[in-house]
Every structure is written in C-alpha cells, then in structure tokens.
Design a protein with these regions (language model features):
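Low-complexity, Ser/Thr/Pro-rich intrinsically disordered linker/stalk segments at domain junctions
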Residues: 2-138
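Gly-Asp-aromatic-enriched flexible segments
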Residues: 130-265
Length: 265
C-alpha cells in the first residue's frame, strides 16, 4: 500500500511539473510572438505635388502604406514654422491598394511641414511618413516693406499712369537724377511685377526713365513720355536687395504703379 501511494505521488508530481513547464513555455512563446509581431512598424510613403505653392492654392499629398491595410485610416498632420506641435488636419481611408491622397488649401504665407500617420494595429507598430517641407508664396506690395534707403523717390497712396490709378505706388519727387529707393527682400522672394511709366500730373514735355535692379544688376529699364506706361515682370531668385532708380527731364514724374513682390513672408 505504501509503495503504491509513493508511486502515484511521483507520477502526479511529474505530471504537474510537466504541465507547469509546458504552461510556462507556452506563455513565453506567446509573449515572444506578440513582441515579434509588433516589432515592425508600418512604412508610410508621401510626396507633395508642389513645394512652393501660391497662397490660397491647394497642395496634394499622396502616398501608400505597407504592409497593405485597405480600409484603414491615415491622418494628415501639419506643423507651421513658428510652432512646435504637429496638428491633425484631415483623415482618409486607404484604398484597395493601400494608397491615400489628401488636399490642403494653403491659406497663409509661411513655411510648413506635412506628415502622414498610420496608427498601430494589433500586430504592427504605428508608422509615419518623412516630413514634407512646403513654402507658400504670395504677392505683397513693395511699399508694405520698410525701405533700406531712399533719395528722391517716395511711397504714395496712389499714382495715375496713362489714365489708370494704381494704389500703393512709387513716384519721383523733385530730383531730376540720382533718385532711388531700395528694399531688402532677403532672398525670400521669387518675382517682381508692376507698371512703369510717367505720372499723369507731369508737364506735357516731361519725360522719365525707370530702372529696376536686383543686387545691382539691371532687370528692367524704360523711358516714358506723358500717357505712356509698360507692364514689368521679372524673377528675383536669391536676390537680397531690390532697387528702383528714376531719372526725369522737363519736370516729368517717373512712377511705378503698384509694385509687388512674390514672397514667402
């Protein structure tokens, strides 16, 4: 009797130890599998159609997620140059090919970055795209900037050239030669536009020459009599200083109607 009891105890102990070992092994295996499954993150690609869009236009951001997750949500985030935190601005669903697309209207002239986030799933860590830098450009009047230097050219509320009144303009004042006004645009602008001509209040025999320079290089020069005007446009990539020179004869008043620069500030 004693021998049978002892044998049974050994069998039970052995069975219990084996079951415990198996349970521990299963738990370890389960834990290991979960960690392994979540060790990989989703890969999110992204590209933007324009890196230098115009104010109030729309940029398009599109890309894909792998491994595929059709129907899953992805979010679009933005961070502006003067901010530290990312802000979620839109959500989309992945199509059958695990691709997505977003559109965003850029309503302010400043640099921003976009990124796309795919949240974690049961067996995959969250993924995010690289940040996409976008610099928005908008037209602004040159007279909204503070002149670096000025001599004989004034900023005026309006100038009338060939019967057309232009707001926020420039015109010569008194000096027949050597008149100029200069602005620093700090290599943050892409183009200049305006209308050059002779102000309508000039005497009949007056004339004027308007010259526009970018970092000392002449980009435009034109001579005008009364009721003469010409549209002016040129690019100013990587230009630090923009100069407007005027020369007049016979009491003429040279003018630039509504000069504007396309800038990212």
């Amino acid at each position: 009797m004693h021998t049978r009891t002892l044998v049974l105890g050994v069998v039970l102990a052995t069975s219990f130890s084996g079951a415990t070992a198996l349970a521990s092994a299963d738990a370890a295996t389960s834990h290991h599998t979960t960690r392994a499954d979540r060790a990989g993150a989703y890969k999110v690609t992204a590209k933007v159609n324009k890196t230098d869009p115009l104010l109030n236009s729309k940029v398009k951001i599109k890309g894909a997620v792998s491994p595929g997750a059709p129907g899953a949500a992805v979010t679009l985030q933005v961070r502006y140059q003067d901010q530290k935190k990312w802000k979620t601005i839109d959500t989309a669903r992945l199509n059958n090919a695990s691709k997505y697309k977003f559109k965003d209207k850029v309503g302010s002239v400043r640099e921003r970055k976009y990124r796309v986030i795919k949240a974690a799933s049961a067996n995959r860590s969250a993924g995010r795209s690289p940040a996409l830098k976008v610099t928005v450009f908008g037209w602004r009047t040159l007279t909204s900037l503070t002149p670096a230097t000025t001599a004989g050219v004034a900023e005026v509320d309006n100038a009338t050239i060939n019967g057309v009144t232009y707001p926020s303009s420039l015109r010569s004042v008194g000096l027949p030669s050597g008149s100029s006004i200069e602005y620093n645009i700090n290599r943050d602008c892409k183009a200049f536009r305006g209308t050059a001509g002779l102000e309508d209040s000039s005497p009949s025999g007056g004339t004027g020459v308007v010259s526009l320079l970018a970092d000392g290089f002449t980009k435009y020069s034109g001579g005008f009599g009364l009721a003469q005007a010409a549209p002016v446009y040129f690019e100013v990539p990587n230009v630090f200083r923009l100069t407007v020179n005027t020369t007049t004869t016979g009491g003429g008043i040279a003018a630039v109607g509504t000069p504007e620069v396309l800038c990212s500030f």
